[in-house]
């Protein structure tokens, strides 16, 4: 009854690191691939798509620019997309429009979407906000844009 989430930005090394009995993956393991910008989406997602993994989640965090997931037809192979801004004193801005674009792609592809956190610097409706760490998750939740569809 235990399910593991393994998060990596090194999906290009994944096939070299799996156990010999991995096959097409384990039922109780989800491998999550992080992407922070379009450059890394274009590099990592084709590798991720072709990897022998039963359950896949894309984590766009820290979200550093708008990312177009449409070319990857995520509805065919992704369980969920997670989006979130960067935390910490050196955090870079996260634009709410970038988050909404990801959410819209998930909506059209019937993929679950979770807006996890705003990040420390959040831009919405022409205004910049500095958000304390303790409120970043709750502020994202208040946006009310999470999508449950596509969940198994």
Indicate residue ranges for each PLM-predicted region.
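Auxiliary Fe-S-binding modules of radical SAM enzymes
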Residues: 64, 69-152
């Amino acid at each position: 009854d235990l399910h593991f989430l393994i998060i990596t930005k090194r999906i290009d090394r994944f096939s070299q690191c799996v156990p010999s009995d991995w096959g097409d993956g384990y039922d109780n393991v989800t491998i999550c691939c992080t992407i922070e910008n379009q450059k890394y989406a274009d590099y990592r997602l084709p590798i991720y798509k072709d990897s022998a993994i039963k359950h896949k989640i894309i984590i766009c965090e820290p979200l550093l620019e708008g990312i177009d997931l449409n070319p990857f037809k995520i509805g065919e192979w992704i369980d969920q997309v997670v989006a979130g801004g960067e935390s910490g004193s050196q955090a870079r801005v996260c634009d709410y429009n970038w988050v909404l674009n990801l959410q819209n792609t998930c909506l059209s592809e019937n993929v679950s979407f979770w807006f996890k956190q705003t990040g420390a610097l959040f831009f919405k409706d022409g205004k910049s906000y500095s958000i304390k760490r303790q409120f970043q998750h709750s502020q994202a939740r208040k946006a009310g844009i999470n999508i449950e569809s596509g969940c198994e």
